[in-house]
């Protein structure tokens, strides 16, 4: 395979047994020793890699293993078997994996199909602004072998991280390496609380001043998703405008799950927000989750505005059937109970977010096999409101067959289809097939970046 001169190629150091490094079965010498060739061997996580195998025995089985450490408490690993062509080469973007962690053709299959190796210890955790080394090893049964270590990054070189605790605002600000001013994005986590750091780092790498904003389960913030005031987010926007001074005064908000619900609520409530991206969101408000603050005897809601609790779907819901969920099952599949709630049309109307008030474009992203909650149905509520009110700005709903609750940026493992919730310790199903969720990630993320860029252009 021919690669342009401008392509920066990483050629692996190798260990090649004599039996596998001589001539091909047909007696023709191979062009060189076994090697793994990769363009841009140091790149952002959301960038696909082109990977080639070269110099292996022709028409032979070659197994490739990918391992990454530094992502949590254990390493992640995948493998796949390919067949080389008559020249002893294989382009992994086009080659069929006929065995391994995934099957078929998937250019980045070795990355999304990684599984956590619970019986192994990981190395030291990598800094969010550092590199995550990925080791690729390729070997044939004849003994030919090659290895290369590559770097994946959430933050490009020069991106800075600043932990924020100012004026009551808590979070982490990522700033691009390039001179400002930069457009700004607020990034919101879901029902686990804390700050959603990874996409904020990636967005800073793409030119945005990105504030991963906490709103509960961080020092100085509530312990639960209970009675969170909209005024807190207004204060965060004021702080961001004064600190970052966003280019063209552009501020977008991105949220996932309950954070997606929140992103839609904020966009409908705060006129300074110019665009919203909501991952696996809800177009209706849901109720509180987790503990109230000591001494807070107010009625419990997730969100308040000017001291008033905002109505939520579960409040006085006449059709909810809690028996629709088997609480003894592990992992728990919750979507069924939410579908029973949606049958109460009055409750849906009371709790619907007036998303049509948003002063900018809206992008909704959902998975049709979401077990956490029916994100497609919930996002459609917002989409239909935008349609019904003839929203004057662009809006779209990207929905993906077979994808679960874990839609995010691409080329990271999607094999964990359940998780232990950090608030209540229970195990929930995310739903989705790993390959389908990976496909949703790969398709949606470039559209998110294009959406933000288009929204910025409208401000100029």
Where are these regions (language model features)?
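N-terminal secretory signal peptides and thylakoid transit peptides that target proteins
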Residues: 1-16
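N-terminal cap/lid segment of alpha/beta-hydrolase-fold proteins
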Residues: 40-42, 49, 135-180
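Short beta-strand element of the alpha/beta-hydrolase
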Residues: 181-190
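Primarily recognizes the serine-hydrolase "nucleophile elbow" in alpha/beta-hydrolase
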Residues: 194, 198, 238-310, 342, ...
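Short amphipathic alpha-helix adjacent to the substrate-entry channel of hydrolases
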Residues: 196-213
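Catalytic nucleophile-loop/oxyanion-hole region of alpha/beta-hydrolase
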Residues: 217-248
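Serine-hydrolase catalytic core
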Residues: 323-403
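C-terminal catalytic histidine-bearing segment of alpha/beta-hydrolase fold enzymes
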Residues: 377-380, 392-460
